[in-house]
Amino acid sequence: MAAKKDYYAILGVPRNATQEEIKRAYKRLARQYHPDVNKSPEAEEKFKEINEAYAVLSDPEKRRIYDTYGTTEAPPPPPPGGYDFSGFDVEDFSEFFQELFGPGLFGGFGRRSRKGRDLRAELPLTLEEAFHGGERVVEVAGRRVSVRIPPGVREGSVIRVPGMGGQGNPPGDLLLVVRLLPHPVFRLEGQDLYATLDVPAPIAVVGGKVRAMTLEGPVEVAVPPRTQAGRKLRLKGKGFPGPAGRGDLYLEVRITIPERLTPEEEALWKKLAEAYYARA
């Protein structure tokens, strides 16, 4: 049996942490260990572990079960007052003896096909997983199930896995409801992505190129001269995929100034300030 994970320790929060504290810790760690930012060998595994912990602790019901049992699956409760045979089905009895002695002996019971119940479960995904799609192995009711995730899947989308639900003839299906985890960099609205772009003050004034992150990796973005803070730069076709094509990525400019200056750089900034005051 795999060792139980301490999700609170993974996120670095106490067991009585509020949802807001859990969310802040998740965002901080996700930003620190995001594979596009952190190139250390263990970053990708750590990033997955952080997302797994947040998927449980951010859900009140999953957190309650985890706090009670140390796992996300609660054991079935014992039947109160002994065993109850009120749900006994003659069909099940018939099928049992037909398996032992063949269909002829107990054919009088009759046998009807009854489809198994559909099972519903939550599927937490990072934006990267939802964007790229691919294969994912999930554990539901003690079973490991391979799931194909279509690219561009959205919050609330339902992925149906045929035949992996409740027992029956035929078996029911497994319905996985997509839940997108918060991302430390991007915000998804419709098919469009939104993020902040840090632009050094000199480049904002005279124009130039800066590096920006997308869900497909880093790209260079052209910054027009005299770009003001708050301006949105649009990267066409860099958003989420959908039936009508790709959405766009909007980068909101945030002007940054250097925290440390060499004597020469400070002298240049002073000259710029003097020129500004002289013109004003």
Curated annotation (Swiss-Prot):
The principal location of this protein is cytoplasm
The answer on whether this UniProt entry bears the keyword Cell membrane reads: no
Q: Which GO terms describe its biological process?
A: chaperone cofactor-dependent protein refolding; DNA replication; protein refolding
Where does the signal sequence lie?
Answer: none
GO CC terms on record? cytoplasm
User: Mind listing the UniProt keywords for this protein, alphabetically?
Assistant: Chaperone, Cytoplasm, DNA replication, Stress response
**Which PROSITE patterns does its entry note?**
DNAJ_1, DNAJ_2
Spell out the disulfide connections: none
Report the SMART domains cross-referenced here: DnaJ
Q: Which family does it belong to?
A: Belongs to the DnaJ family.
Q: How does it assemble?
A: Forms a heterononamer with DnaJ and DafA in the resting state. Three copies of each protein are present in the complex.
Protein name from the UniProt record: Chaperone protein DnaJ 2
